[in-house]
Amino acid sequence: MYHKILVPLDGSKRAERILPHVEELARRYKAKVIFLQVVEYKTVPTTEGAFINLTEQEFDQAKKQAETHLEGIQGEFREKNIESKIYVTHGPVVGGIINMAAQEGVDLIALASHGRGGISRVFYGSVAAGLLHRVDRPLLMIRSRKTE
């Protein structure tokens, strides 16, 4: 049923709450797992237009940290004989996830929602909500709460 599973992560423990579910699916269907972290340029509006909040050096460091983090997760899955790949890309998160899903031809996107609501969702947006409205393939989402 599932041959490739895309797992977008953001470096947080809450996002990693999806991993046991992905592990179970990957074992059951002998699926390949693709771990993705999209490093987003943070912009700050100014009177002259928007500018990038991260310096090039800070951005490169963020990408390197993401790669190191994903390599650690990939190693854990390798020890369990689950085939996986990692990608670190940059740009808008939802678009990056959708593009990677198409590029890799995944059968499922699996992620943990941070469960933001209300004013927090207005200011920070919601990757989960963005995917729900734009994704063209099955989506497995679990809600990860602060207490978890």
Sequence positions of predicted segments:
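Small/aliphatic-rich secondary-structure junction motif
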Residues: 1-53, 147
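A cross-kingdom feature marking solvent-exposed beta-strand/loop segments within repeated
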Residues: 16-18, 80, 123, 145-146
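Short beta->alpha linker loops
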Residues: 39, 88-92, 114, 126
